[in-house]
Amino acid sequence: MAATLSVEPAGRSCWDEPLSIAVRGLAPEQPVTLRSVLRDEKGMLFRAHARYRADSHGELDLARTPALGGSFSGLEPMGLLWAMEPDRPFWRLIKRDVQIPFVVELEVLDGHEPDGGQRLARAVHERHFMAPGVRRVPVREGRVRATLFLPPGKGQFPGIIDLYGSIGGLCEHRASLLAGHGFAVLALAYFQFEDLPENLSDVRLEYFEEALALMLRHPQVKGPNIGLIGVSKGADLCLSMAAFLKDNITATVLINACVANTLVPLYYKDLFVPELGCDQTKNKSGLMDLRDMWNNPLEEPNHQSLIPLEKAQGPFLFLVGMDDHNWKSDVYARIACERLQAHGKDRPQIIYYPETGHCIEPPYFPPPIATVHFVLGEAVFNGGKPRAQSRAQLDAWQRIQTFFQKYLNGEKPARHSKL
């Protein structure tokens, strides 16, 4: 009897959807190696492998059979995805065209030899970034350069603006996946895309105000409440939007955020917020570790860079990697909490993830432990351990959806004060 490798759902699934992977038709107790490979849009290969032993019936199910070693060990049904590593160091898995799936090739090899034995079975599976019926609408309106993702159907949907960080360009994968869960999501570029500024220093908050107005008047966006989600520099921009463009922004998710304005000064009308500086001489040899380089935003004169988040009207959800080495996200979340409470506001929701680094992505993305920083142009240590971060990404993804479902319900949120 020939071995068979089954993957469910069969043939295709959404990237954030778990898979059921099983092998049948092996000899009792047969040692095998499972291997996965994915090629990104620039041709880089990502790979993972794990050693297994079939049960007495010649079967193994990744949901019930622990890996004996390899890229991961233990019971990890999705390890063949999140444990993938690039062939080239510091390469990050990024989805550049969400209309085309990633194709994952899975193989079963005989034995536990490092170079692999005879191939016993093979399967190919497509991982899509747009659920059936999700619509992708390019937006080139006024100065706004973005893509709006709409769920299936003609109704109105809770609206979210999605910002990535200093990576620049237009990142659509998180927005496209969230649209599959019932949200109208605007993936917003703000520099290094088409005719937008090449440099982050030329971006003004009025640009984000224009994007907010666009969402509010869209016939398929359920007003009057809009949510924001941002990571890294995108997160402190979300904080600034919530603080200075506060009308109608009623729910903000901040992934490894700084409570101060970072990298470049912020301009809005007559407002000027300086950037929080850093001291690169504090870096040790080897990979650049930014965690201890940043100035303390509570000290003079750095406090001028603090974002007055207490002016925001809606609640916050802070998702914090405790091993973030780009900056002290855990410290900044505590500062935010103290500042809000000092102004009589409710405590924000803060979720701390141990052994989790800076780049918290949707589920099953391989955590980029170290990558080349798009602004600095150098290899930067992001922090995190793959197993722990894979769990954090799965938990964070559910919390993001729950948070937005709760607060983007078309009603004005109750204003709570503890004064």
UniProtKB/Swiss-Prot annotation:
Motif Peroxisome targeting signal location, chain numbering: 417-419
Keyword Hydrolase included in the entry's annotation: yes
Gene3D superfamilies: Acyl-CoA thioester hydrolase/BAAT N-terminal domain, alpha/beta hydrolase
Protein origin, superkingdom: Eukaryota
EC number(s) from the headed UniProt entry: 3.1.2.-
Main localisation: other
Summary of the tissues where the protein is detected: Highly expressed in white adipose tissue. Detected at lower levels in kidney, liver, brown adipose tissue and brain.
Subcellular location: Peroxisome
Family: Belongs to the C/M/P thioester hydrolase family.
Its job: Catalyzes the hydrolysis of acyl-CoAs into free fatty acids and coenzyme A (CoASH), regulating their respective intracellular levels. Catalyzes the hydrolysis of phytanoyl-CoA and pristanoyl-CoA, two methyl-branched fatty acids derived from phytol, that enter the body via the diet.
Record's protein name: Acyl-coenzyme A thioesterase 6
Native source organism of the sequence: Mus musculus
